[in-house]
């Protein structure tokens, strides 16, 4: 399995995070495809991977850092801080990461030997935890007390009685709102969040919650839809 960045720009590319096929752009991406400004070599570099073989003029490397994933377009160096290229693709499962290095002008991938080490600046790494599934919360939201009005709504929803009762219509609208917010918003947010990282989960979950709220207070509109 392979994945590319949704964008190749500088900065934190983990916003949309996840794995996708090579053709897709749903990887660790975010932003545009622009590169990093060339500010010279960093003060320190750390091992990022070892060279395996050349592929279509690029270096294929296996990550040796089990705790981090490199940014797309992050500069790659030798131990002496000489830049040789930039990260182009990230491949493989989360527990066995590979990456390719697009060579800088004058650099040739076939000039390297198997197991040659490549290095990266520490500020161009993302923690691997960012791309792992989030555990589901064990805490449950407190149930709201229904009261008499809630009872009327439940009666109508379950058996279809009391069609003309105002309380029945209000309750039915609230029910629709709850279903939309909890049923569609939460799974959609959870699904996207698990696969796509924090942004998907937060945005979709938030929208689902908002839909639920609107349904709850929009009894009139939802009630008419039911008819």
UniProtKB/Swiss-Prot annotation:
Bias type Gly residues, positions: 16-37, 148-227
Region RGG-box 2: start-end pairs: 149-226
Main location, first listed in the record: nucleus
Gene Ontology biological process: snoRNA guided rRNA pseudouridine synthesis; snRNA pseudouridine synthesis
Gene Ontology MF term list: box H/ACA snoRNA binding
InterPro entries noted in UniProt: Gar1/Naf1_Cbf5-bd_sf, H/ACA_rnp_Gar1/Naf1, Transl_B-barrel_sf
Keywords noted in UniProt: Nucleus, Repeat, Ribonucleoprotein, Ribosome biogenesis, RNA-binding, rRNA processing
Residue ranges of coiled coil: none
Cellular compartments annotated: Nucleus, Nucleolus
Keyword rRNA processing appears in the UniProt entry: yes
Region spans: Disordered: 1-48, 136-227
Region: RGG-box 1, residue numbers: 4-35
Family annotation (Gene3D superfamilies): Probable tRNA pseudouridine synthase domain (2.40.10.230)
TM region(s), chain numbering: none
GO CC annotation terms, alphabetical: box H/ACA snoRNP complex
Known function: Non-catalytic component of the H/ACA small nucleolar ribonucleoprotein (H/ACA snoRNP), which catalyzes pseudouridylation of rRNA and is required for ribosome biogenesis. This involves the isomerization of uridine such that the ribose is subsequently attached to C5, instead of the normal N1. Pseudouridine ('psi') residues may serve to stabilize the conformation of rRNAs. The H/ACA snoRNP complex also mediates pseudouridylation of other types of RNAs. The H/ACA snoRNP complex mediates pseudouridylation at position 93 in U2 snRNA.
Assembly, per entry: Component of the small nucleolar ribonucleoprotein particles containing H/ACA-type snoRNAs (H/ACA snoRNPs).
Family, as annotated: Belongs to the GAR1 family.
Protein's name in the database: H/ACA ribonucleoprotein complex subunit GAR1
